[in-house]
């Protein structure tokens, strides 16, 4: 990790908050930022920009959303907005998209979500539950970015995390609409 980045973050967040957010939490769910230190590097990047209006395309299980909301809350308190756009499950509308593997390999996670929480971890409902602490700061949109992204006022967005559909036309559309 670069020394200048750490100094900047220490100045922005203070020692206690810096130590707290350097650990990317997985909340007993799947995440695309699972490789060692990738989640931490991502949070450092976001913290260095201090966005107040964050857009995530491709929310998946909501792990990155929760980490980002925790970070933005530590920086701005309640003065931030998080917008998350995702398919939140398979449907006829998104049958052509490449859907990430939503199955858990760990049988305890299967039991936990199916019988304890009684919710599909990939559903809009499950992500809302994970983010309920920030219910006044979040706006989750269910749908395909090919049809919805152009309706979002990008002039109000400070930071975009693009991790949605991986099909060529979807990526091209997302980049064009940003």
Language-model segments: what does each one mean?
Residues 1-34:
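Membrane-proximal basic amphipathic "stem/tether" segments
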Residues 27-30, 35-178:
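S-adenosylmethionine/decaboxylated-SAM
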């Amino acid at each position: 990790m670069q020394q200048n980045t750490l100094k900047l973050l220490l100045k922005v967040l203070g020692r206690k908050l810096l130590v707290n957010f350097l650990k990317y939490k997985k909340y007993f769910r799947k995440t695309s930022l699972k490789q060692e230190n990738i989640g931490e590097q991502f949070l450092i990047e976001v913290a260095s920009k201090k966005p107040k209006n964050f857009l995530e395309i491709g929310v998946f299980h909501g792990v990155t959303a929760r980490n980002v909301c925790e970070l933005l809350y530590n920086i701005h308190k309640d003065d931030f907005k998080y917008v998350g756009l995702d398919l939140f499950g398979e449907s006829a509308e998104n049958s052509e998209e490449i859907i990430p593997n939503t199955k858990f390999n760990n049988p305890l996670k299967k039991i936990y979500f199916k019988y304890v929480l009684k919710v599909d971890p990939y559903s809009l409902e499950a992500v809302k539950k994970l983010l309920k602490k920030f219910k006044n700061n979040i706006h989750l949109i269910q749908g395909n970015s090919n049809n919805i992204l152009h309706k979002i006022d990008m002039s109000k967005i400070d930071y975009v995390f693009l991790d949605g559909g991986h099909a060529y036309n979807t990526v091209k559309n997302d980049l064009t609409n940003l």
